[in-house]
Amino acid sequence: MQGSVSSLEIIILAAGQGRRMASAKPKVLHTLAGRPLLTHVLDTAMALAPRAIHVVYGHGGERVPAAFPEASADWVLQAEQRGTGDAVRCALPRLADDALTLVLLGDVPLITPGTLKTLCARAADGIALLTFEAHYENQYGRIVRDDQGRVERIVEWRDADAAQRALREVNSGVLAAPAAHLRRWIPRLSATNAQGELYLTDIIALAVADGVPVATASPGDPTEVWGVNSRADLAVLERAFQERQAAMLMAVGVQLMDPRRLDVRGQLIAGRDVQIDVNCVFEGRVELADDVRVGAHCVIRDSRIARGARIEAHTVIDGADVGPDCVVGPFARLRPGTVLGGHARRDDRVQR
């Protein structure tokens, strides 16, 4: 059945240059929590178990797909960046006729599977938009509704008049619609607008004209739909991501001496009654068993720390296995391949 989970195909738009990043690197390759922005979006897409993932790339050329050699994705080149509508047009031939198509943005890394499942459920045989209320200055496209509250169209900021810019409901850029509808609407898009581009958002007015229902959904947390357009944006999202990690750790019994001073740049698996002091960095896959204590200013990378171990302040552990009830540090360094048996002690005089 059209719109069922089994028919889901995802398009990720990742072709943009990101001029405000002031970088030679494609925007989606900039890192959040130690991983490229696009990696976060790919992981979320995979969590939905789609039939296919199509990534539209352009700026930076083959550097983008080359950075993800293990990704289960269909890479689609947008040779000339002519807008989001053109990006989806490039991917249209790859979609199955019965596909429910979910369009994601490669520079919006904090979107969650739960929010996207809700959005897809509301698409049915129509179209569903992810919108949110923005009570701060921004340049998102505005959602225009009629007197009965039905969505009429989306007006991009540069094309909006003063009254439209005053609207608070804005477009996140994420939407879901059957591929059959997209094939009908995309060829009808026009570049007659302030940016001279094909706006994907213009399909909303076409849907309304065709009598196709337009539904909306909202994220549980506004940070889910915040995008990265500058280094400042990236810094804000980095903190939002780390706050989310801190909340999840505390929910499973970890004591953080200051949740605002924690950096998880990979996967941190922690048992109960773990205590982590301030300014610690965890990279790659790190496992902390029950009752582990980690002192301030430690860096732990791709390591396992067994039950009851104590890692004192200013210690660096890289690719090591630390046994139960060990004491490491302060100011110690364990190099890759180090294995410490139970109750061992290593201080600042030892670098393994």
Which residues fall in each region the model found?
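Conserved alpha/beta core of the MobA/IspD/sugar-nucleotide pyrophosphorylase nucleotidyltransferase superfamily
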Residues: 6, 168-271
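Short glycine-enriched, charge-decorated loop/helix-capping segments at active-site entrances
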Residues: 25-31, 189-192
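Conserved core of the sugar-phosphate nucleotidyltransferase
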Residues: 62, 111-195, 201, 212, ...
